[in-house]
Amino acid sequence: MPHHRLDFNVNANSFGVLLFFLTLTICFISGCAPKEEGPDNVAKVIGSMTDSLPIISLPEDADPEAPDWKGVDLDPKSPVKPSYPAEEAKQFLLPEGYHIDYVLTEPQIEQPGAISFDGNGRMYVLELRTYMLTADSDGTLEPVSRISRWEDKNNDGVYETGTTFLDSLIFPRFVLPYGKDCILTMESDADNVYKYTDTDGDGVADKKEFFTNKYGRSGNVEHQQAFMYWGMDNWLYSTVNAFRVKETPGGVIREKTGYNRAQWGITHDDDGKLWFQGGASGVPSYFQFPIHYGTFKVENQFAEGFEVPWGAPVKIADMQGGMDEVRQPDGSLNRVTGSAGNDIYRGDRLPRELYGQLFYGEPVARIVRQIKPVVSEGLTTLHNVYQEDKSEFLRSTDPLFRPVDMVTAPDGTLYVADMYHGIIQEGQWAQKGTYLRTKIEQYQLDKVIGLGRIWRITHEGNERDKTQPRMFDESPADLVRHLEHPNGWWRDKAQQLIVLSQDRSVVPELEKMVRESKNLLARFHALWSLEGLGALDKVLVGQLLKDQNPRMRIQAIRVSESLYKDGDKQLAKNYSLLMKDTNTDVAMQAMLTANLLKIPSLRDDVTKLMTSNSAKGIQVLGEQILNPVEIRGWMVDKGPELTASQQEAMERGSIIFNELCVQCHGLDGTGTPLGNGTVMAPPLTGSPRVQSHPEYVIKTLLHGLEGPLDGKTYPGSIMVGMGDQSDGWIADIASYIRLNLTNEASIISPEQVSEVRLKSKAKIGPYQYHELLASVPQNIAPSDRWKVTASHTAPTRIGGTDSPSSAFNFEGWTTGETQKKGMWFQIEFPEARTISEIHFNSPPKRRGNYRDRIPPFQSYPRSYDLQVSLDGANWNTIKTGKSDSADTILSFEPNKTKFLRIVLTDDIEEEGEIPWSMRQMKIFGLLQNEKLLN
């Protein structure tokens, strides 16, 4: 909230002085305060509520004796009215000695979903301004959300100065500060992550750069990926996605990980282990082992009673599951049903017993839970610290308290983001006739929108640290000193900025800290800083593998994985030896690393270890390493199903890659390292180029490629053409690269290679990069200048945009009714351009509920004409076709057109309501003065 300076000029006569002090006294007695600037959002919400109490009836299909309805109170009720922040603060219940104060509220921010700090202590707020504005999710995907940035310039503990760093966003998924005046973020239903930078210092991003692609997922806004998070290992992780990404001098690379099954929240502990937060499960989702080792199943991870929340009485019983989830008589939640935001508290200004414990929000229960992790025989069990008291760390009697994120702050305290919102369930589960919808209407919860607060939790006797970070003004050498700070936030941020700087002048100082510091955590961060700078010394790592402290040995094992991938295969002997370590945690870490890297002696080593060490963790890991079971992901695409012949092609491609390509591109496709952060050849992992049009890879393999690539020059500056190889050989290696190394593209057939070989037979010598791009159809980014229309359109999901232009993203477009002859979808370009291909996906549509086994219907167009026009009046049909699968590719001779239209040519003959749907549409054309989609 802003602080206001009261300026006055009192005449020095007795009447003026008397009047001034009389006014001051009245204000003191009555508690008056300076009037808030800007709109009064609380008053606006209250004003939107009806004075006549809604009359609520039992829905027609509801069974009053069913568990979710039995005993429901449907009497008319007064609306749940929002409180001002000072009044909400009085409704919190905290353990003795703790205090909570707001640091930022509406109207400055609205509907905060996450918070994060940059190197100067400025707080970025992810404002999800379209979340549940109505019970039907209307407007969720409108471009009005934002990321704002806030500062406490006068150091009074309140963030009074802010800017809208990035505006007009479609439900952004995360905000990650990424260096000075720079963030990473992406929007819902999108596939690309972008880097936004403020280049002129006005607090508003003015530069947008592509960072990485293939990051998105389909689904409603609750089920898409979120929370890009910088781990201590210098990789970037996110919820949902089973991979991690990392920016290197050669580009952004990616590696596969296990399935984290998380929705909203990632944090890490002092040892760098990530803790993922589940959503609908209401509990942490994956936390036993670092996620990049895969997903291992562990039983009994939660103490008895863990799934029972102990919120304060809220009385309104607005739980999605109905009356059987309501604790009587206080109306609170009796079993966790949602969770959001998490933090391993690593600050230095709260009681020491909180350090290293997990905090997360349960916004349906209106609680923040404190978790004590208990490790026994290498496995972790989670305990609610206040379980015996039937309580929680933070509770509220205000039904609108919605804790959705929390972080250890630069001042050493704990911050909580409170959306302070009426509805906290996506509209798909709040439809007419549901129990939740009944409660929403009964208490007018849909009216409570546009609010939000950020809270600071402190403890008496522990003043917040008023040292304001100024890391952007410091040298890398200054940053190294912060690695010894008692507050984990300072250590994490200093490491991140050291790595982003790529300034190797601090390597000697970092190596000295690793060897000599008395601060174990500083040694950890210094070691990972060296890794991030590409400056790991084999001798140093070898010494650390024998360190007296087992936690240091574990870090040395993890960091050595980078050296192993860079070719130091002698480390396999160390891993075998460390599996015999007397410390169970060290032995388990050696198992995990050996399994990840698939060292030759893995099975023998693990079998011997399981025989000699009976610890539960050893047995659980060993059994699943020796006898792996398929672990299903959650909301994660599996990739294309391969036929037997295609799988054989993959195996042949793997042999080619490992015999030939690894020499320059490295075993994992990240480029063979040459030291000083350079690699021999461009990374192939997660490569936008490799995953683009098939002709790019085919032409490169046939004819070769030389010179700078995207402005970067590599020591192995020429890729020799292999046109003397057969079409099948080219197809095998091209397919392997496009479907492995964390790439997710299409398989390539020998017939495709033959066609490209024929088209490019006149080419002599290797391509230059710009020349290759000019010859390959490019995926053209959709523009706001494109006019996209359709004969029929309907939302593809509850809260959808009902817009044909959604065909270009994960939301998709649909006719909403059965396919009929004459239905059309049209694109009008700003000016005529040459196009040659159209790709789109038509997802199967489920019918019935999950209990029914009704096969889904296929929504691809059964028969169609592809038409083009230069004036929108005279049309030519350039292709006639029939789709028979979810993925449709329309290829044709390059054609210059201003209008492009797909028209259905027949009525559908199948039974049932089968609309036409398209999503992730891609238009390919020749290079033009138009932005290309990376």
Locations of regions flagged by a protein language model:
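Sequence/structural segment immediately N-terminal to covalent heme-attachment motifs in c-type
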Residues: Q647-T672, V690-H703
